[in-house]
Amino acid sequence: MDALKNNGIYSIFPESESSYDLDTTVNKLVSEIEARSWNVSFTHDLQQTMKKHGKDVLPVKVLAICHSSHSGQILEKDHERVISCMMPCRISIYKKSDGKTYVSRMNPAMMSQVMDPLTAKVMQGAAADVEEIIQSALKTE
């Protein structure tokens, strides 16, 4: 694990510990997503998917989320559509063997450094929104 932290994977895929259980964390995230006019287009239950294929893993749910003001700017232009493979944004909620719940996401702001100005601006804006959603959802009451 220290080797992963040392090689920078956590700067590409930031991880936050949740003080809530997995289902509560998912529900808090969905509430924040919807309150900010984002949409949950799909929830992937990777534990159930793996179980269908004979693998037993700890719970993992991935929220696929989108906001048309961000995605529309990319999808309206032919040149930018190439990054649609990274869409929609994803937030992963999972348990680890320590029994705690964690939230991870991709850091598109890092990738935006090699993008054209419009794509970089959109990616940075979406990343900021997603980070606000996560931080707000993980706040303890």
Regions found by a protein language model. Give the residues of each.
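Compact, glycine-rich, soluble single-domain proteins
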Residues: 36, 42-49, 53-89
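Terminal, regulation- and interaction-focused segments at domain boundaries
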Residues: 1-40
